[in-house]
Amino acid sequence: MSNQELLQLAVNAVDDKKAEQVVALNMKGISLIADFFLICHGNSEKQVQAIAHELKKVAQEQGIEIKRLEGYEQARWVLIDLGDVVVHVFHKDERAYYNLEKLWGDAPTVELEGVIS
């Protein structure tokens, strides 16, 4: 599966659970961690967990190894490492506080209209 297809899979999974303000950053040449960061948020701990759970389920169904999953129990900032795509699922309040989009402001955003199937 290509990185772009992996990103599309992640976008569709978080969208299925009504994640808000879904933003993808192209990290190629900027970070050694991943090619893409996908950032989104939920409005409650339950929604954050539902988004993370859906992504985990879809990844496992596709045979994609989840390299790391952190923060699920607290549901304030869940990080799901899919290898070349790292997904950050925030609680709304934490997203505003950490503001990863500003922190990685030199990373171009990916137009999601072309990614969502």
Curated annotation (Swiss-Prot):
GO terms for molecular function: ribosomal large subunit binding. It is found in: Cytoplasm. Coiled coil: none annotated. InterPro entries: Iojap/RsfS/C7orf30, NT_sf. Keywords: Cytoplasm, Repressor, Translation regulation. Gene3D superfamilies: Beta Polymerase, domain 2. One of its GO terms (cellular component) is cytoplasm. The keyword Nucleus does not apply. GO terms for biological process: cytosolic ribosome assembly; negative regulation of ribosome biogenesis; negative regulation of translation. Pfam families: RsfS. Belongs to the Iojap/RsfS family. Interacts with ribosomal protein uL14 (rplN). NCBIfam families: rsfS_iojap_ybeB. Functions as a ribosomal silencing factor. Interacts with ribosomal protein uL14 (rplN), blocking formation of intersubunit bridge B8. Prevents association of the 30S and 50S ribosomal subunits and the formation of functional ribosomes, thus repressing translation. This is Ribosomal silencing factor RsfS. It comes from Halalkalibacterium halodurans (strain ATCC BAA-125 / DSM 18197 / FERM 7344 / JCM 9153 / C-125) (Bacillus halodurans).
